[in-house]
């Protein structure tokens, strides 16, 4: 958690808070920050926890949810998500990254995302979508992926919301 926190505090003009339902995590995090919010335990998702945290804080108009399993999150990515939320048309943002390895493409732990032409997410899957096979229905190689006309993207577990979206 501290590594994620340390990455997040590098974002200029951003206040960083840890939202948790665990007294144990709260106590542990007091070693490096006082910005800890204790939330209810019964949230069905992290987004619900973020909504409660934003309600507790009261005065922020947008929030970026960086989960604790992202110790190498790029502070520039967080800044870019905040920047995207400045648009009046944008209520919620997330991030994706091009997949360059067949191993990642077929790894069910890597969530894939399909987007429309404006990069709006259409759907997510742990499977390779659309399916990528050669003419004989065999998985392709990294070199073939590199030269494929189809781009594949992995979803990054980071989300940004406007307060009004979470209300």
Predicted features along the sequence, with ranges:
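Hydrophobic/aromatic residues located in beta-strands of well-ordered beta-sheets
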Residues: 16-18, 63, 93, 121
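N-terminal glycine-rich phosphate-binding loop and ensuing alpha1 helix
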Residues: 1-20
């Amino acid at each position: 958690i501290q590594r994620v926190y340390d990455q997040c505090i590098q974002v200029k003009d951003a206040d960083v808070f840890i939202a948790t339902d665990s007294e144990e995590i709260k106590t542990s995090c007091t070693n490096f920050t006082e910005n800890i919010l204790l939330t209810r335990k019964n949230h069905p998702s992290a987004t619900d926890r973020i909504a409660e945290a934003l309600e507790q804080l009261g005065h922020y108009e947008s929030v970026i949810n960086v989960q604790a399993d992202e110790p190498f999150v790029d502070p520039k990515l967080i800044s870019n998500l905040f920047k995207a939320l400045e648009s009046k048309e944008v209520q919620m943002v997330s991030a994706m990254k091009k997949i360059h390895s067949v191993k990642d493409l077929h790894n069910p732990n890597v969530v894939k995302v399909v987007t429309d032409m404006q990069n709006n997410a259409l759907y997510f899957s742990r499977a390779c979508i659309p399916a990528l096979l050669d003419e004989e229905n065999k998985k392709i190689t990294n070199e073939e992926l590199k030269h494929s006309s189809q781009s594949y993207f992995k979803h990054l577990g980071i989300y940004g919301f406007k307060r009004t979206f979470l209300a």
